[in-house]
Regions:
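Phosphate- and other anionic-substrate recognition elements at nucleic-acid/protein interfaces
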Residues: 1-163
């Protein structure tokens, strides 16, 4: 799971939360909830941005859908505004068009935040890297910030205040 914390356009934290493969989906969800609760406690965000999930036909996709819903619910329980953005919306905001590849999104993010260039994979080895989740998380934050700038401070929940 990619994680990014932005404040006023500055990248304060970025990373990937990894979870052990546990036999039970409930145990994996519990791990995810615990990680998100820890991040909320550590960073105290004003806004939590999650990617809109898709309807998948396999067990992993279903688990991701449930985890996305759990993350949003956990944020609301902590009084945090929750914004859900579709992948194409994020890609358009970051890379200029909605059908951008993960590599194109990552390159656009690395151009904005040069400290992330070290995480760009060489050549075509993109799917072998775990960092694409981190780039996705930063892209979600950037898309949310861009939306708040275009709508004005009073018309968007994507305002990032002190974490």
């Amino acid at each position: 799971m990619g994680v990014a914390v932005l404040e006023n356009g500055s990248l304060l934290y970025h990373g990937v939360e990894t979870f052990r493969k546990l036999p039970s989906p409930q145990d994996r969800l519990k791990q995810g909830r615990a990680a998100v609760a820890r991040l909320i406690r550590d960073f105290r965000p004003a806004v939590l941005v999650v990617e809109k999930t898709f309807i998948g036909k396999n067990r992993n996709a279903a688990l991701l859908n449930v985890l996305g819903d759990e993350i949003a619910a956990l944020g609301r329980r902590h009084g945090i505004a929750v914004v859900s953005l579709a992948p194409n919306t994020v890609k358009k905001a970051v890379a200029g068009y909605g059908w951008a590849t993960k590599a194109e999104v990552a390159n656009a993010i690395a151009a904005r935040y040069p400290e992330l260039k070290a995480y760009l994979p060489p050549g075509r080895k993109w799917k072998q890297q775990r960092h694409y989740n981190m780039f996705d998380a930063v892209a979600l934050g950037v898309a949310c910030l861009n939306a708040s700038k275009s709508r004005g401070p009073h018309n968007s929940h994507c305002q990032i205040r002190a974490p």
